[in-house]
Curated annotation (Swiss-Prot):
Residue runs in coiled coils: none
Keyword Magnesium among UniProt keywords: no
Cystine bridges: none
Organism: Synechocystis sp. (strain ATCC 27184 / PCC 6803 / Kazusa)
Name used for this protein in its record: tRNA-2-methylthio-N(6)-dimethylallyladenosine synthase
Task of the protein: Catalyzes the methylthiolation of N6-(dimethylallyl)adenosine (i(6)A), leading to the formation of 2-methylthio-N6-(dimethylallyl)adenosine (ms(2)i(6)A) at position 37 in tRNAs that read codons beginning with uridine.
C-alpha cells in the first residue's frame, strides 16, 4: 500500500520508555513516507501508545480511543492502532471492546510497526502481543527534541513487585549490547544532540543478561561500565540515566558519576514506601535502611546532587503509622522532586486480590497530605539555588513568556531566562538564579554562549 502523503498522529501516555518508543514508531512511519500532523482528526493513522501503570491512565486511553472509533465508522480508511502496555495487557479483549481497531501491539513489537501495518493494509485485523526478542532498531527515530535524546539500553523487568503490571506487559530484561548503544549515541552526536538520557525500567540492572563475568565474579557489563564506555563520545556534553532500582544501586556507580564530568548530578531512585513491612509486602527487595544508606553515599560523594523518586501511599493494609514512616523518610532525605500516587489495583497483580484494600477516602487523604509535604520540601530545596550560577542547556522557548528560553540545570531543574532561541538552542549558558519556585527557576544569563 502506498502511504506517501498520508498523515499520522501519535498520542503517548506514561513513562519515558513510552516516549522513546513513540519516537521510534514515528521514525518508522516517516520512513514509510507518512508525515506528522498535530491534529488527530486530520490524521490517516492514529496511534495511542498506552500506559497501564495506573487505572486512570488506562481509562483516559479508552476515552480518547472512543472518539476516533466513532470517526472510523464514517471514515473506514482510517487506521487505528493501540500500542504499549494496555495493548499488551488486554490483547484481543481490546478488539472485542473496540472492534474498529486495526492493530493492537505490545511494547516489544514497537520496532516491527512497519511489518504489522503491512498485514493491516492487506486487510487483516492484527494482535501482536507474543513475547519475543526485541529487534535492534535501525530506523531513525523522529525525536521530539533536537537537543536531548532518549536511548534505551535495557528493555523489560525481572522484578515481581506485588502491585506492578510492568513485568507482565514489557517482558523479561533484555539488555542491548554496549556496541549498539555506542553506535546510536555516535549518530546522535553527529546529528547535533547534546544530552542523552539512558533509559531502562531498572537501568542499574543493565547487563545481567549479557554474557561474561570479570575475574572478581561480577557481571562483565554493568551500567557503570557502560557510562565509562560512552562517556568520551565527542559532541555529547551531558549524560543522564533513569530509572534506578535500590536493589542494584552500587557505590561503584556513584563513584563513576562523581568521576565522569558529563554525568549529571541527578539520581532518580524510587523508594515507594518508607515502611519496612509495606516494602516487604510490595516485594521490593530492600529495606528503608538500605535506601537511606544509598542516599548517604550519594551525599558523601556528591553533596549537592539532586535526588528524585516515586512513592505510593494507600497500599493495601497500610496503617497511619506506616504512612507516617513514609513522610518521615521524605523529611529525612530531602528530595528535589517526588512522583506521587495513591495505590491503584492493577489486573493480574497479587496485591489487587488482597482483602485489606483501603478506602478511596483514606487513600485520597494520604495523597493530599503527601503532596503538601512534597511541595513544601521542593520549595525548600529550590532556595539553595538562589544567587548561584548554574549551567543551563537550552532546550526551547518558554511559550508562556515571549523572549524567554528554557532549559535544564545539571540537577534537572527547569530554568527560564531572557534570550533568543535562534541563538541559544542547544547551547550551555551560565545563568545566575534570581528566583526559585518549587519546581522551576528563573535567572539571568551571564554569557549568552559558552558551548
Amino acid at each position: 500500500m502506498n502511504v506517501s502523503h498520508r498523515r499520522y498522529h501519535i498520542i503517548t501516555f506514561g513513562c519515558q520508555m513510552n516516549k522513546a518508543d513513540s519516537e521510534r514508531m514515528a521514525g518508522i512511519l516517516e520512513n514509510l513516507g507518512m508525515t506528522y500532523t498535530d491534529d488527530p482528526n486530520q490524521a490517516d493513522l492514529v496511534l495511542y501508545n498506552t500506559c497501564s501503570i495506573r487505572d486512570n491512565a488506562e481509562q483516559k486511553v479508552y476515552s480518547y480511543l472512543g472518539r476516533q472509533a466513532k470517526r472510523k465508522q464514517v471514515e473506514p480508511e482510517l487506521t487505528l492502532v493501540v500500542a504499549g502496555c494496555v495493548a499488551q495487557q488486554e490483547g484481543e479483549q481490546l478488539l472485542r471492546r473496540v472492534p474498529e481497531l486495526d492493530l493492537v501491539m505490545g511494547p516489544q513489537h514497537a520496532n516491527r510497526l512497519d511489518q504489522l501495518l503491512e498485514q493491516v493494509w492487506a486487510g487483516s485485523q492484527v494482535v501482536a502481543t507474543e513475547s519475543l526478542h526485541i529487534m535492534e532498531d535501525i530506523t531513525k527515530p523522529r525525536r521530539e527534541s533536537t537537543v536531548s535524546a532518549w536511548v534505551n539500553i535495557i528493555y523489560g523487568c525481572n522484578e515481581r513487585c506485588s502491585y506492578c503490571v510492568v513485568p507482565n506487559v514489557r517482558g523479561v530484561e533484555q539488555s542491548r549490547t554496549p556496541e549498539a548503544i555506542y553506535g546510536e549515541m555516535e549518530v546522535l552526536a553527529q546529528q547535533g544532540f547534546k544530552e542523552v538520557t539512558l533509559l531502562g525500567q531498572n537501568i542499574d540492572a543493565y547487563g545481567r543478561d549479557l554474557p561474561g563475568t570479570t575475574p572478581s565474579g561480577r557481571h562483565l557489563h554493568t551500567l557503570t561500565d557502560l557510562l565509562y564506555h560512552v562517556h568520551d563520545i565527542e559532541g555529547i556534553d551531558r549524560l543522564r540515566f533513569a530509572t534506578s532500582h535500590p536493589r542494584y544501586f552500587t557505590e561503584r556507580l556513584i563513584q563513576a558519576c562523581q568521576e565522569l564530568p558529563k554525568v549529571c548530578e541527578h539520581f532518580h531512585i524510587p523508594f515507594q514506601s518508607g515502611d519496612n513491612d509495606i516494602l516487604k509486602a510490595m516485594k521490593r527487595g530492600y529495606t528503608r535502611e538500605k535506601y537511606l544508606q544509598i542516599i548517604e553515599k550519594i551525599r558523601r560523594y556528591m553533596p549537592d546532587a539532586a535526588i528524585s523518586a516515586d512513592v505510593i501511599v494507600g497500599f493495601p493494609g497500610e496503617t497511619e503509622a506506616q504512612f507516617e514512616n513514609t513522610l518521615n523518610l521524605i523529611e529525612e532525605v530531602g528530595f528535589d522532586l517526588l512522583n506521587t500516587a495513591a495505590y491503584s489495583p492493577r489486573p493480574g497483580t497479587p496485591a489487587a486480590f488482597w482483602d485489606n484494600q483501603l478506602s478511596e477516602e483514606v487513600k485520597g487523604d494520604r495523597l493530599q497530605r503527601l503532596n503538601h509535604l512534597v511541595s513544601t520540601q521542593a520549595m525548600e530545596r529550590s532556595q539553595r539555588y538562589l544567587g548561584r550560577v548554574e549551567e543551563v542547556l537550552v532546550e526551547g522557548e518558554n511559550l508562556k513568556s515571549p523572549g524567554q528560553v528554557m532549559g535544564r540545570t545539571r540537577g534537572n531543574r527547569l530554568t527560564f531566562f531572557q534570550g533568543e532561541i535562534s541563538e541559544l538552542l542547544g547551547k550551555t549558558v551560565p545563568v545566575k538564579i534570581t528566583e526559585a519556585r518549587a519546581f522551576s527557576l528563573t535567572g539571568e544569563a551571564l554569557s549568552l554562549v559558552t558551548a
